[in-house]
Amino acid sequence: MRVSVIGGGQVTDEQAARAEAVGRELAARGHTVVCGGRGGTMAAVCRGAKAEGGTTIGILPSERREQANDYVDVPIATGLSHARNALVPLNGDAVIALAGGVGTLSELGFAGIYDRPVVGLATHDVAAAGIDLEPVDTPEAAVDAVEAALEA
């Protein structure tokens, strides 16, 4: 399955390590990572996936595929700037949300619109927006939760 991983473009070392662990876990279980294709969470999750031999897709805000991080296998240039945030959750079967800012929050909103299963690992509280986000505590639990949601 394809799993969209969303999170901030600028992250702490702890947040990067968490994202990398999510990428490793997804790839180890045979899942493809979809993300925004740039830095921060996006680079870390792709780096983790590539370390386990996984496949990564980056949906870029610019018109240039070369702007993808070094760990993206399939860069998709959109030329849409922040509007590309609608495409990241759309192209995953489920979404894992990590720490981030308003861009991540917008992606969470689109995940709700597209009715994607959403799992949160140290991310925004979106219950008031009516988004059914399942909070988890570890990267392994995040992948367990998206797998369970898609089997239901």
Describe the residue ranges of each PLM region.
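Acidic/glycine-enriched connector segments
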Residues: 39-114, 122-126
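Amphipathic, non-transmembrane alpha-helical secondary structure
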Residues: 17-20, 24, 86, 109, ...
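Hydrophobic beta-strand segments of well-ordered beta-sheets in folded domains
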Residues: 1-3, 116-119
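Glycine-rich beta-alpha loop segments
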Residues: 1-57
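Hydrophobic anchor at the start of a short beta-strand
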Residues: 33, 56-57, 116-118, 133
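Short acidic-hydrophobic, aromatic-tinged amphipathic segments that line or gate anion-handling sites
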Residues: 75-79, 132-142
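Active-site-adjacent beta-strand anchor residues
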Residues: 35-36, 98, 136
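A charged, well-structured terminal subsegment
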Residues: 90-95, 136-152
